[in-house]
Amino acid sequence: MVPVGAAMLLLALAGSVGRTGNVAGPGTRAAASALAALPATMLWAWERPEDLRWLPPEAGVAYVAATVELVGGEARLRPRGFPLLVRADTAVLPVIHIDASMREPPLLNAAQHAAIVAQMLAAARRSGPQVVQLDFEVRASQRPFLLALVADLRRRLPSGVALSVTALASWCAGDYWIDALAADEIVPMAFRMARDDGAIRTLLAAQGGFTRPRCRAALGVATDEARVDAHGARRYIFSPRAWDQAAWRHVQPP
């Protein structure tokens, strides 16, 4: 990740990647150590200006470093266009967000695969805490592409870099299909759940969290939705607006 200064401007991750890392699989000791070094609370910093210099040291920031737009047969890179200010002691990790066009569904070809891999490897080369995150919501027909992509990323990332992948909450409930996903951390997003919202919230309240083996390590929640009564070793928090101290206080445990 880009080195962080006392008040640093984080800009785009761009360019191609040359060398690749060692072969590794999910759950390696090195990757587990990298994840263990992350704070238990991570704020998602989306594509907008963010000043998080007030953030307590026990929290970190997962910031969108770049977006790869998949349109038809093309992969269009959109580097981060807004500043992010953090303190030097704040743990940060880069997120590569994948935006698959609804109007022109992506072909999910080799060039698009390669473009995503290039951005993830570029993020890993600049990483401080050795964790990178892929944010890619796929349709059922696109699942084989995601499985192959994540497997390729895990093979090509250095063994000491952990791979975190976001997941729809339904993938960790009745529509569980991610057991073979070669990620070191899976983050089920328990917000924006549409028609599954009521059922999944009931399930989480009854079980105390997701119980599927790959879905217990982390949980994604949002500031503008009802509190999710569920445990998770690490919590990622999304805000639809720029973060401030009031929003931070709102998401603290009662």
Regions found by a protein language model. Name each.
Residues 1-254:
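Secreted glycan hydrolases and related glycan-binding modules that recognize and/or cleave
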